[in-house]
């Protein structure tokens, strides 16, 4: 491996609290993109005090990925959270709305070419299809004549009425956008119609409707999503279903092409302020436009209600300036690495607090990156944002005072939990930090990193599953927390435990008097949390929580105890937040998914080539 030492350039001196005016895409501290990863077709919502972004998982070439959402309370630190539904990995352009009539949340997503609608009790679900069967279709293709079904979005009017809009390839003569008014049952339509492309000129896909001062605004995307022609146009009307009047383009590729192909937007309203959230292509631009990232800019209006042209930025926006974040000790640190792919993926990009820049090693095998904090400092939390938050990564974090002698800070070399950020806790006083990537979930992806953030305080605000243990994680004496965020394990202090299959579940059985213990300073009763497990008692499985004496939670420690009777359990979960009743009920009936580790022997460079790239003689 080539060992490269790089020093952060003068650009890194930009204060962490805000990027310089007219920031470039690679300016340290730039606020756009707002998410660390490849996500497209974003719908942003605010429920209560929390922002949610629902988006297509990108970067795979076909929008394949698990059901997920991003959430944040401060609009600065975003956490990726898994959802139970859809159980397909083909989930495009998701949208969530809350229905005032029943208080429920409704989750809309599409597959080509159909729409599915789910219902749940929280913005996170758990979801189930409103029509019963998981794959039941609410809006099939050509449900409205000459409207190709894709990219569904909901709109709730002031009177509580709910409307739905959908469509793609609406450019043909006589085609356009499908639309309809939903019945109160949210399963059928009282009215449907075509909004023709003679009203929404150049309509291609991604309709989004919002209302301001009695005017209905219909925003949509035009041209080709894979190149610079992609843009956002809009039209207005006096009623939700039109007729609409076309007004032109409001968002397009910028002059230097670093905001490339912006489109498929949603709109967030905060008081009298409006913001447009959209995707754009990554920098440098990947082939075929399948590595999109989410950005935000302000949406402003003229006195007559027309929308001003949006000038897309790399600065982004701080919607919650009153909410301060802890100092990131890694920002602008001196960096060394085992290798880097080329100058577009330099190691210092891992310490620049910029979701649009990435350190990528030259190989997809083991790799390391080392940070020099400049002096010995207290280190209690390290957040790592790997390239693909929906895949798990395996890694080791170490600290050192001299760069030669290393102590383990967090060992996740057996990790099987996907997430972003990956959060690791410890208590070190050191100048150097080294993260070594050892493997992952998928072949050929490697250990690329958007950002490494280091804190001198315990930063535990990301809502995550801290413990996740299945029977497969038990080796006879140790129960490894491989599906949980906290690095650690349960140790057998006394007695005997064994793996066995019981009534359809793989489990571990503790013989009478057996004790398993895990210690970690983040465990405890005083902070918000949810602790559950599935236990086998009296011939059947049921859910238990910390009120069961066999789960003894105290500050810094969790004990699993078998008293006079044997204790059979599996799917032990501990969240650092309080679950809603519906979420607990779902966990009671479901098992932790244990993903396979990529075959190390198959790792190598990835080739993606098709006839589209053929030129005569080349």
List where the protein language model places each region:
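Non-cytosolic beta-sandwich-type ligand-binding/adhesion modules
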Residues: 72, 117-122, 229-238, 377, ...
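Secreted extracellular polysaccharide-interacting domains
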Residues: 420-421, 509-524, 541
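Aromatic, loop-rich ligand-recognition surfaces of beta-strand-rich domains
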Residues: 351-463, 571
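Extracellular carbohydrate-recognition regions
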Residues: 313-340, 460-491, 531-533, 584, ...
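Extracellular glycan-recognition surfaces and repeat-rich motifs
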Residues: 339-348, 355, 477-507
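Flexible glycan-contacting loops in extracellular carbohydrate-active proteins
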Residues: 547-564
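Substrate-binding cleft of secreted/luminal carbohydrate-active enzymes
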Residues: 586-617
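Beta-rich carbohydrate-recognition and catalytic domains
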Residues: 21-201, 211-257, 272-273, 279-323
